Amino acid sequence: MTFHPQPQAGSPKPWAFPAPERGALGNGLTLLTSHRPGQQVVAVEVLLAAPLDAEPEGLDGVATIMARALSEGTDQHTAEEFAAELERCGATLDAHADHPGVRVSLEVPASRLDRALALLAEALRAPAFPEDEVKRLVANRLDEIPHELANPGRRAAMELSKELFPAELRCSRPRQGTEETVRRIDAAAVRAFYTAHVRPATSTAVVVGDFTGLDLPALLDDTLGRWTGASAAPRPRPAITGNDEARVVIVDRPG
């Protein structure tokens, strides 16, 4: 039997991560843009300086609820209308809260970038945080917690953070809050956290895709550039200390 010759690997080619173009909008929003010809789906990432250690005492999880509520209605659209507008653009919008801050992610075909950027700016500029939507998100989060505690991997990760870091550090506690802290979250708490920490002057937007035929500076100025907010000094990062002494921890998980 004759086999096809084994393919040979080609010579490795040098590669370097493309350096983005840096800039800023008039409202203080830092911009990083990267033109990638052929990448017809544009990705936009906005990092908000709203870290988990900024959450008020006893309200662990409020950053997560705020992130989830950003697209649940604005001053111009209800939650259902906003979702429908995103769908018409063929866009997806997600938000996630983590220790460094809240990350808002948009993906959209380049041909519909203008409308999708307007919706993103709307969600950042004027989220409504309706009482009923916040209550629903809190209820959803409370439903998630028992499943996380029942998952051995998630339970082990929580215990690891608790063992490694001092109790006063936010990173020692569950990122999305506990049942006790999440129950305290309401629309007023979400609005207060948003007002205190979400503003363009301390945020960064990263835009990557094929910008051929697009006036990207004008698009960004007409959308994200209309987002306003007070200036603020960068939030100091807490010193992180940890106990990395070797030990074995047994976690009881009844059931």
Describe the residue ranges of each PLM region.
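N- or domain-start disorder-to-order transition segments that initiate the globular core
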Residues: 2-41
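M16/MPP (pitrilysin/insulinase) zinc-metallopeptidase core fold and M16-derived inactive scaffolds
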Residues: 43-110, 173-174
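Acidic/histidine-enriched alpha-helical segments
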Residues: 84-87, 127-146, 212, 232-245
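Buried hydrophobic packing residues in well-ordered domains
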Residues: 28, 46, 64-66, 86, ...
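An aromatic/glycine/proline-enriched structural segment found at the starts
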Residues: 1-16, 167, 171-175, 180, ...
